[in-house]
């Protein structure tokens, strides 16, 4: 009788394990994919180059008052924003970023996500901040930058299309330029 009980429990645990794999397959696939995409390290040289690209771009966009919203993905993945955007997957260059944000371009609205030296997504919708005491002159782009930075560790750069001012947002705090 113990042999039968042992066999039933062994079989049941096998079927439960297989059932769990089938039921949670999409989540497991996404989790394994995310583990495979974790950057082990980014060299200081690569970081400097990426920052330089973003600085060049936002300065040029600010000069001609073209609005921009750029999030640099760090350790917290920007999954919700990514799912709302369009996959771009190209090298992050000033020319490419300027092309994306050029007015009337099909993907100029929303934010861009940069991971490493790649533009991964464009036309992303970032969550708006719920802070009630923000300056009423801040537009949607700035509110989206603050909102995303409240939920993630991504530094975000904003160019105002009204004033050409460049702002930096990190962990819910904005520094206006």
Q: Which residues does each predicted region cover?
A:
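Divalent-cation
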Residues: 4-6, 16-19, 24-25, 29-177
């Amino acid at each position: 009788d113990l042999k039968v009980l042992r066999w039933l429990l062994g079989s049941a645990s096998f079927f439960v394990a297989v059932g769990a794999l089938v039921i949670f397959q999409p989540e497991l696939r996404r989790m394994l994919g995310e583990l495979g995409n974790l950057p082990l390290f980014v060299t200081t040289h690569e970081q400097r180059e990426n920052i330089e690209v973003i600085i060049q771009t936002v300065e040029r966009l600010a000069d001609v008052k073209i609005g921009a919203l750029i999030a640099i993905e760090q350790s917290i993945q920007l999954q919700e924003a990514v799912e709302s955007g369009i996959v771009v997957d190209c090298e992050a260059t000033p020319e490419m970023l300027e092309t994306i944000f050029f007015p009337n371009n099909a993907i100029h609205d929303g934010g861009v996500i940069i991971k490493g030296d790649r533009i991964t997504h464009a036309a992303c919708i970032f969550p708006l901040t719920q802070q009630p005491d923000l300056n009423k002159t801040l537009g949607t782009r700035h509110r989206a930058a603050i909102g995303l930075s409240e939920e993630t560790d991504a530094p975000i750069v904003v160019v105002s299309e009204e004033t050409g001012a460049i702002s930096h947002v990190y962990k819910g705090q904005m520094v206006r330029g």
